[in-house]
C-alpha cells in the first residue's frame, strides 16, 4: 500500500470557486506548507496558477493536484493542470466536524484539501472523468 505522502513530492490543494481559486502547495511527506496564493478563474488566471505551481515545485510533474469540484468550478483548472502534464484528483470528502471551531477561509480550505490527500492510498484517489470520446460528443450535442 503506497500513500500519497510517500510517493509524491508535492500536493497542490485547490479550493475552487466561480471567480477565484485558492491554491496551497504542500511538501511531502511532511505536509509543510510551501506557499499559498489565489488566482482568478479566467483563462489567464489559470495559466498563471499552473506557472506559479511549476515555479514552487521546480516543475516536478510528479506533483499531485487535488482540486475541489473537478466537475464544476474546478474543471477548467483541472484540464489546464492535466494538459501541463500533472496528475489531477478530486478533493477527498472532508470531515466538517473535525474542523469545527478552527476557522474557514479559502486559503485554509485549500490547505486542508491538500492535507486530506496526504494519507490516502493511490487507489482511494477519485480521478476526474476524461472529456474524450462519447462524453465529449454528448457534451457538444447537448450544448447545441
Map each language-model feature to its residues.
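Phosphate- and other anionic-substrate recognition elements at nucleic-acid/protein interfaces
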Residues: 1-144
